[in-house]
Structures are given as structure tokens and as C-alpha cells.
């Protein structure tokens, strides 16, 4: 195939329930990005990192705040409707799955389920929440470099 290696980081084959995404879409359409930006940042980083890593978090919070609400709602709809639980098993490419041990958005069980569905996967769990590449950049980079080497 055209893809020789695949890296799936802090993701899932299913991000249900749809009702949660519908509520998020309604909220952003009614009130804009401000309420979601803070809530997202709180979920995307561990408490310890949030307390010590404001320099890394501030630009991400600003980016969320500046995101077009309609565009964000569209992304939420795409995530709501995505269900790869049955088709993930069709992936036959060398795959690295990276997850965060403290990720409430895509918990470790989601990373493990992806790895099991795909088979022959290298699974790396980092001490991080949802943005493991920001919270653990060195460990994340090493995992990627080792996989691609």
C-alpha cells in the first residue's frame, strides 16, 4: 500500500456517546468557544502539568478560543459520527498507538482496544493526559523515532 507506517496518538475508534457531542455542538453554537476552551484545556492536561506548564498551555488555550465556532461544531459532528470499531481490524500497516495513562478524552482502554483490533501494533502509554505530545514531548518523540527507525 501507499502507507508504510501509521501512528495513532491519543485517539479512539469510537468517541461516543453521540448525545455528548450533540450537547457540545449546541453549547458552542449558543455561547461560542469560551466555555469549551477552558473545559477542554482542563481535560487535555494532567493536573500536575497544568499547575507547572502554563507556558505550554496558554497558546493552546488561545488557539481554542480563536477557533471558529461553526468549524468546531463541524468537527464535533464528524467525531460524533465516526465509528471505526469494526473497520479498524482492516488496517494492515505497521502501526504505533500512543496513549496517555490519564487521558479522559481517549482513555487507556481506547488505546488498548485500537491496538487489539489492529493487531501487531506497538502500544506506548505515556504518563500524560490527552495532549501527550505537549505534556511528554521527549518520550513522545522517542516513541515516534524508535517506531520509524
Predicted regions mapped to residue ranges:
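Flexible "cap/lid" loop of the alpha/beta hydrolase fold
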Residues: 1-37, 43-44
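Core-facing hydrophobic residues within beta-strands of well-ordered domains
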Residues: 2-4, 118-121
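Short, surface-exposed alpha-helical segments at coil->helix boundaries
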Residues: 18, 22, 54-58, 108-112
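Hydrophobic, aromatic-rich cap/lid helix
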Residues: 20, 38-39, 57-86
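Hydrophobic "lid"/C-terminal helical patch
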Residues: 40, 76-79, 114, 140, ...
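Short beta-strand/loop motif that positions the catalytic acidic residue
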Residues: 91, 97-99, 103
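Short alpha-helix in the alpha/beta-hydrolase fold that links the catalytic acid
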Residues: 93, 107-116
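Catalytic active-site module of serine/aspartate enzymes centered on a nucleophile-bearing elbow/loop
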Residues: 119-149
Amino acid at each position: 500500500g501507499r502507507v508504510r507506517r501509521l501512528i495513532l496518538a491519543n485517539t479512539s475508534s469510537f468517541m461516543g456517546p453521540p448525545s455528548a457531542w450533540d450537547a457540545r455542538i449546541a453549547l458552542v453554537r449558543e455561547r461560542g468557544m469560551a466555555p469549551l476552551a477552558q473545559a477542554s484545556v482542563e481535560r487535555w492536561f494532567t493536573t500536575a502539568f497544568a499547575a507547572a506548564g502554563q507556558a505550554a498551555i496558554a497558546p493552546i488555550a488561545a488557539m481554542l478560543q480563536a477557533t471558529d465556532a461553526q468549524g468546531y461544531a463541524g468537527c464535533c459532528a464528524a467525531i460524533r459520527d465516526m465509528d471505526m470499531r469494526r473497520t479498524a481490524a482492516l488496517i494492515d500497516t505497521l502501526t504505533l498507538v500512543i496513549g496517555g495513562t490519564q487521558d479522559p478524552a481517549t482513555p487507556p482502554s481506547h488505546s488498548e482496544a485500537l491496538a487489539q483490533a489492529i493487531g501487531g501494533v506497538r502500544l506506548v502509554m505515556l504518563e500524560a493526559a490527552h495532549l501527550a505530545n505537549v505534556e511528554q514531548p521527549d518520550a513522545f518523540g522517542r516513541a515516534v523515532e524508535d517506531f520509524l527507525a
